[in-house]
């Protein structure tokens, strides 16, 4: 699969679109929270309101669904990209940003819960 700019895609896992109501929270900077845009076994991307000053590398991310009691805690991550995205209709004074993260080494329990999330909360 190729990226838009023509360079080869580097992801090992296909990103899946996530259903509404699935939220990611970056840890330790819990000011970065928002709707998950897409996710795979290798990482995720979510959008949040924030400024460049807030943009710090996260160490962990937590995933939850506001539709039910799903909560996946303390997934180790590495920030891949944190960019401002164009949002012409926003009423917020803060810019909209997208944070892309790669998962670190997950334990067995985290892998099981992530697989459950991928099955239940994504569009196939």
Place the predicted regions along the sequence by residue.
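Short, conserved beta-turn/loop elements at beta-strand boundaries and strand-helix junctions
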Residues: 41-42, 81-88
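N-terminal helix initiation/capping motif
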Residues: 1-52, 115-124
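A generic structural micro-feature
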Residues: 14, 53-55, 69-71, 91-96
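Short conserved beta-strand and strand-loop elements enriched in small hydrophobics
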Residues: 21-26, 55-72
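Hydrophobic residues positioned within well-ordered beta-strands of beta-sheet architectures
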Residues: 59-61, 75-77, 99
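Short beta-strand-centered aromatic/proline hotspots
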Residues: 33-36, 73-83
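Short beta-strand/turn micro-motifs at beta-sheet edges
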Residues: 33, 87-90
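C-terminal output/interaction extensions
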Residues: 2, 89-124
């Amino acid at each position: 699969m190729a990226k838009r700019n023509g360079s080869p895609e580097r992801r090992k896992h296909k990103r899946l679109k996530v259903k509404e109501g699935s939220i990611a929270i970056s840890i330790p900077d819990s000011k970065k929270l928002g709707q998950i845009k897409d996710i795979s076994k290798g990482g995720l991307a979510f959008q949040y309101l924030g400024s460049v000053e807030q943009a710090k590398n996260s160490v962990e991310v937590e995933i939850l669904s506001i539709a039910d009691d799903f909560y996946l805690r303390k997934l180790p991550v590495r920030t891949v990209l944190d960019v401002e995205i164009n949002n012409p209709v926003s009423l917020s004074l803060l810019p909209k940003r997208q944070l892309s993260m790669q998962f670190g080494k997950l334990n067995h329990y985290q892998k099981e819960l992530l697989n459950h999330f991928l099955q239940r909360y994504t569009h196939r």
